[in-house]
Amino acid sequence: MATIKDVARLAGVSVATVSRVINNSPKASEASRLAVHSAMESLSYHPNANARALAQQTTETVGLVVGDVSDPFFGAMVKAVEQVAYHTGNFLLIGNGYHNEQKERQAIEQLIRHRCAALVVHAKMIPDADLASLMKQMPGMVLINRILPGFENRCIALDDRYGAWLATRHLIQQGHTRIGYLCSNHSISDAEDRLQGYYDALAESGIAANDRLVTFGEPDESGGEQAMTELLGRGRNFTAVACYNDSMAAGAMGVLNDNGIDVPGEISLIGFDDVLVSRYVRPRLTTVRYPIVTMATQAAELALALADNRPLPEITNVFSPTLVRRHSVSTPSLEASHHATSD
């Protein structure tokens, strides 16, 4: 990895001159600027954005990196962090990472370049070592929905595996033994942990796992439609379905309704997250509550305290999800059980 000394050597200037160019000092000549920027580009050198921000002093700005701000889950996260920023006299800047390593990294670096000393970051694809390097550069950076070894006190996460176990166990307690699962096709720990939680609950109850009852799709409504359509196409040998999140569950419910399959009379359905859509689909969706508002609020408060070197607030580093009972789950009817057995 290139250093500031490498840039200075290639540009034919001193390290101090490189520093002046990086910090936009008026003392740097135009020729020096051109030489330094050319060297930085040739070496793919990314300056320590945090050092620049600190050198310029920080503005009253909180940075937030989310997966996709159009996702209702991340919308709730944004609103919670924005409320903390507002009540503490700060502005909020947002970057989208889209569960892509390069875009997550760019979003973080862009926010630091905009002098955000307090950062709340949802990043699932950046490797631990690289993320640790960024955490060392940024004392006010807090991770949400991820635990990074060595920085546990600056991380706030949810026990996703337990949440999926809770959802699946609820279906089992209602008498279901043939349970499908609609999983996210994103290669992130959330998807892996929730799928494992589903398998855990089945194994604990002595129910053999059947991979034909697991389908994958984008973690949104259209992905839920596609995954449920695929599951139905394999034969209706199930009486209940657990979903990666509420958006997939909403899409799945639409497919079931379109096919004249009653929820929960013929097939029970359970989601995960408890976002707004769960209250407005019909029937209202039984789900697992992800306390994202509380978690995001604590993350923002912690980031601001760390950035200002103030006493740290009391926080919970790993939250436990809870079951929210609504109207999309019931005991399997005789007709549903017959369908599942005969198909």
UniProtKB/Swiss-Prot annotation:
Signal peptide: none annotated. Pathway: Carbohydrate metabolism; galactose metabolism [regulation]. Keywords: Carbohydrate metabolism, DNA-binding, Galactose metabolism, Repressor, Transcription, Transcription regulation. GO terms for molecular function: DNA binding; DNA-binding transcription factor activity; identical protein binding; transcription cis-regulatory region binding. One of its GO terms (biological process) is DNA-templated transcription. InterPro entries: HTH_LacI, LacI/GalR-like_sensor, Lambda_DNA-bd_dom_sf, Peripla_BP_I. The keyword DNA-binding applies. It holds the Pfam family LacI. Residues 1-56 form the HTH lacI-type domain. The keyword Transcription applies. Residues 4-23 bind DNA. Repressor of the galactose operon. Binds galactose as an inducer. Homodimer. NCBIfam families: PRK10727.1 (NF008002). This is HTH-type transcriptional regulator GalR. It comes from Escherichia coli (strain K12).
